[in-house]
Amino acid sequence: MRRRFPRAVTLAAMTYVAATLALARWTDDDDGATRLRRRLLAADSTTPLWRYALIPFIAAAVGWGTNVVALKMTFYPLEFFPGFLRFAQVKGQPFGALGGWQGIIPSKAGEMAEILVDLMTKKLIDIKEIFTRLEPKTFASIMDPEMRCVTEDIFETVLAREAPTFWQGLPRVVREEMVAEAMAQSSGLLEDIIADLMENVYDVLDLKTMVVTLAVNNKDKVVNMFREVGAKEFVFIERSGIYFGFAFGLVQMVVFYFVDKHAPEQGVWLLPFFGFAVGYLTNFVALKVIFQPIEPKRVCGVTLHGVFLRRQNEVSEEFARLNQLHFCNAENLWEEMMNGTYKEKFEALVRRNAENFFDKAIGSVTTAKLIIGAEKYDEIKCTIVDMIFASIPDCVPVTYDYQNEALGIEDTVRERMQKLPGKDFERVLHPVFEQDEIKLIVVGGVLGALTGVAQYFLAFA
């Protein structure tokens, strides 16, 4: 399939060619050329050398400035600006048909989250393997005090309300023993729920939807995550603009000096051209050296390796920490199971275990049905199961610290990410720039060209 040439590059090239042709036509025209030559000859024929010497420093400033702008446009604004033009935002793009901009990461938070989830589930973690690290007895012992209180209240309230004759007809000692037995068996209920969950976690947890939803609803967390993971690379991008800009500026200075001396009328387009080149190339080179080469290469005794890939161990540690802090933690996992894609399946899992628990707590199901009737028994059972399920969100938070430690998601992600091949590890940060890097590069070129125009008319015209 033939790759389409990026529209941003095509537009920039057409604009530059059109401007150059217009300028050439104007200078070729007798009147236009005469006006330009008269202007140049009317000025002091000897341009101070310090003005030429400023060119590399201005180029360094352009390189730094365009790179800073590129980074700002990557992360901000979090929402489309201006807001009144949001209706015209191109779907899946950071820009709008009528203008405006939204940071690349905020505009594609969902897509980037999908890429990272695919990386995690295919290369780093198996969610079923992770959940097998839970110990049902330990989980139950932590949550049991909360569940005992709930169980006592549920049984006393429901049986007294739904079967008052049966309940009040029982001796007080029997009632207390029945409630005590239910409370004692609540730990077993929790163990059964966790054991069932460990076996069927694929059916009740949609990890990708969870992470993508969290990313879309918390764009600031996604931005902060990428900023912290790639902090040193972003500093490199900013500073490299100075170094590369200065180097390109030295070439620009030499070329412009001779052109200005021998064909001064050509200077009007030369500085904007070099400005475009500096802005374009500093962004281009900075983005390339971060991710290329993926594997270390020796060239003339020097080892070349992508700046980001050199920090694989350090980045893996930071990524794993932030991933658990913002996304893959016990609180979010339970929230997804209870209210997410497969919430009906999770509810069914809890209910079947709660129903077994109720039958055990009652003692003789047959006797109970004979006394209060099968229909009433089922009605009471359904009510109690409903209340047990409704109590889960209030009781389970006490186990989050234990679960986070037992699941060990942070440690697992860190250790396995540190061992990833370079081509896989590169996918952690590169998607931030990959799809829209050409837009950032062209913006750098346009800003550089505008600086070149200002530089020419302020210093040399």
Per-range role (PLM):
Residues 1-11:
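Helix-loop boundary elements of multi-pass alpha-helical membrane proteins
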Residues 4-5, 44-57, 234-238, 242, ...:
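Hydrophobic, aromatic-rich alpha-helical transmembrane segments
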Residues 9-21:
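Cleavable N-terminal signal peptides of Sec/SRP-targeted secreted and luminal proteins
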Residues 19, 24-27, 34-42:
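Low-complexity, Pro/Ser/Thr-rich intrinsically disordered segments
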Residues 25-29, 67, 71, 258, ...:
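Short hydrophobic alpha-helical membrane-entry/anchor segments
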Residues 36-230, 265-428:
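Large intracellular
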Residues 39-44, 251-265, 459-460:
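Transmembrane helix-loop junctions at the membrane interface of multipass transporters and ion channels
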Residues 211, 233-254, 434-458:
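Bilayer-spanning, highly hydrophobic alpha-helical transmembrane segments
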